Amino acid sequence: MRFSTAFLALLSVGFSSARLQGRDQVPVALDDDHKIPGESPLKLCDGDHKDDILKITKVDLSPNPPKAGESLVIKASGDVTQKIEEGAYINLSVKYGLIRLINTKADLCEQIKNVDLECPIDEGKLDIVKSVDLPNEIPPGKYTVFADVYTKDNKKISCLTAEVRFERNSIATPWGDL
C-alpha cells in the first residue's frame, strides 16, 4: 500500500495521474506537447484540457527519476478553477511492464490526505510540497501510471499519465558492486 501511496503522491497535484482505460477514454500523449512543466515524468492525456478544473502549472521531483529506498520530494503547483468537494473520485491504473498492479476507483478526498490536503479544496492557487519515503523493495522496471479524476458530478478535474523507470540498486561488496 505504501507503493501506491507513493504513486498517488507523485501524481498528487493532478490528484493523481492519467487515464483509466474505459468509457470516454482519451489516448495518452505520446509526445512532449502535453508534458507538465518541471522536472517530472508527468504528462496530460491527449485531448482538450481547457475545461479541466485543475490546471497544473509545474511539478518537480527530487530525485528525478525517483529511486527505490530513497525519499522522493514532490513540489507541485496548480490552479483550481472550481471548488472540489466530497464525492470526487479517481480512476487509477498502475502497470509494471504489461502487468496491471492496480486498477481501482478511489475516493479522491481520502487519497489526498496522503499529501496533507483535505476536501473541500477551494478555488485558487494550490501548492504542494511533500516528501515520501519510497520502499527499497520496489522491483526494477518500468511503471506506467494512469489516472482520471472527476468531481462527484462527473466533471473532469484532470487527466494525467506518468512513466517511471526504477533501476536496480547495486550492492557494494569487497569484490565489487552486485
Curated annotation (Swiss-Prot):
Residues 1-18 form the signal peptide. SUPFAM superfamilies: E set domains (SSF81296). Gene3D superfamilies: 2.60.40.770. One of its GO terms (biological process) is intracellular sterol transport. Residues 19-32 form a propeptide. One of its GO terms (molecular function) is sterol binding. Catalyzes the intermembrane transfer of phosphatidylglycerol and phosphatidylinositol. The gene is NPC2. Keywords: Lipid transport, Signal, Transport. It comes from Pyricularia oryzae (strain 70-15 / ATCC MYA-4617 / FGSC 8958) (Rice blast fungus). Belongs to the NPC2 family. InterPro entries: Ig_E-set, ML_dom, ML_PG-PI_TP, NPC2-like. PANTHER family: NIEMANN PICK TYPE C2 PROTEIN NPC2-RELATED, PHOSPHATIDYLGLYCEROL_PHOSPHATIDYLINOSITOL TRANSFER PROTEIN. GO terms for cellular component: fungal-type vacuole lumen. Monomer. This is Phosphatidylglycerol/phosphatidylinositol transfer protein. CDD domains: PG-PI_TP. The keyword Acyltransferase does not apply.
